[in-house]
């Protein structure tokens, strides 16, 4: 038996994301007042994705509780749709985008923090909030993947969706630069056009890789779980 029910964990994670978003939006930073506001940053978009995803998880839990034993076929159909949406969102957005934000942020930060998160931001963003945006995303999504089985979409549709998201965000970053004359991320100012194309192409490939990683990890976790349950059943059968 789990020490903490997964439903309680999801609710706690959802509340933590709501707190992080509220605290982040309350910060008065110059970048929030410029074109695109917070929506030009992938970190903020990811926070919204995670909050919406865990909101759907909590809604699914509540719906499952309310429909349990009711025998109402229409309610069961709606619950299945909600579960399908939850699974799709984890596969296509919550896992790949969340892992991408954590990995890329800390890799660039370790190399040269001024390229991704200038020291000036320490005057606006407290350390706990920075970790809430760029660190805890990973363990939270792994907890969700471990506590609930998620049905991935077909590989072609999943990869198409993550490619669409990646290209859409890249075009959005380029549009912000076109309008303001400034790149969203400082390191893009220091590389040439060719290097930017390579970087954008590499990030799209990385997003696809993370989608596949999530699929493999999900299958591994639940295939292992199934094998363990079958092993436990053997003595009973004997």
Swiss-Prot record:
Membrane protein topology class:
Multi-pass membrane protein
What inducers act on this gene?
Answer: By dihydrotestosterone (DHT).
Q: Which UniProt keywords apply?
A: Cell membrane, Hydrolase, Lipid metabolism, Membrane, Transmembrane, Transmembrane helix
Localization terms from the record: Cell membrane
Recall the GO molecular function terms of this protein's record. Answer: hydrolase activity
Does 4Fe-4S appear among the keywords? no
| Protein name (database record) | Androgen-induced gene 1 protein
Biological source species: Homo sapiens
